[in-house]
């Protein structure tokens, strides 16, 4: 299996692991795949973990990143791969002067893990993330779980409280299949 096929397979496993249905996966692949920045962690020449990120500006003019689909193959878990993917993505946004990161955990277990790596809960706030074509990108998420955020600089004091984050149409990145 070639590298690109391996990454696409990893992405499909990521969606399947949180119960995202096939029609959303197909729509996502067609519309959003090239708009996202993908972080991939390799173990040798095997893609062992993946995470996607969309950049946005919220209604207050603050710049953020939306993390989505963090997934590590089961045989590579508990080796720091997920933490490394998060760290790389945070460093990328920090260097580009972004304000915060937001994500919606898919389970109570993942919420505990995100807390361990520095994310905080947005108290009693449930958000929706809408893509540039109106697709709700929070499909497949446990809607009872609150969103979480990570501040990218010390003077960040505005906890994001928007109910809806809209992802603008973005240029495609170099990562294509």
Predicted regions and their residues:
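Conserved acetyl-CoA-binding loop-helix of GNAT-fold acetyltransferases
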Residues: 72, 78-91
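Short alpha-helical
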Residues: 2, 108-109
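Conserved active-site tyrosine of GNAT-family acetyltransferases
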Residues: 114-119
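Conserved N-terminal entry element of GNAT/NAT acetyltransferase domains
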Residues: 1-5, 162-171
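A conserved beta-strand-loop-helix scaffold within acyl/acetyltransferase catalytic domains
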Residues: 4-71
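Conserved GNAT acetyl-CoA-binding A-motif
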Residues: 93-107
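Conserved catalytic-core motifs of GNAT/GCN5-like acyltransferases
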Residues: 102-104, 120-148
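Short hydrophobic/aromatic beta-strand or adjacent loop that forms the aromatic wall/cage
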Residues: 36, 142-147, 170-174
């Amino acid at each position: 299996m070639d590298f690109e096929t391996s990454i696409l397979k990893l992405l499909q496993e990521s969606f399947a692991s949180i119960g995202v249905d096939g029609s959303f996966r197909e729509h996502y692949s067609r519309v959003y795949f090239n708009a996202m920045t993908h972080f991939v962690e390799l173990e040798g020449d095997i893609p062992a973990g993946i995470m996607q990120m969309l950049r946005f500006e919220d209604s207050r003019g603050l710049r953020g990143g939306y993390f989505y689909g963090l997934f590590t193959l089961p045989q590579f878990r508990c080796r720091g791969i997920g933490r490394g993917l998060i760290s790389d993505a945070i460093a990328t946004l920090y260097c580009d002067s972004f304000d915060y990161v937001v994500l919606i955990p898919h389970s109570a277990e993942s919420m505990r893990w995100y807390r361990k790596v520095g994310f905080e809960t947005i108290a009693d706030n449930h958000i929706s993330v809408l893509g540039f074509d109106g697709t709700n990108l929070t499909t497949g998420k446990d809607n009872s779980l609150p969103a979480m955020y990570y501040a990218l600089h010390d003077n960040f004091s505005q906890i994001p409280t928007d109910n809806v984050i809209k992802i603008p149409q973005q240029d495609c990145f170099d990562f294509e299949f």
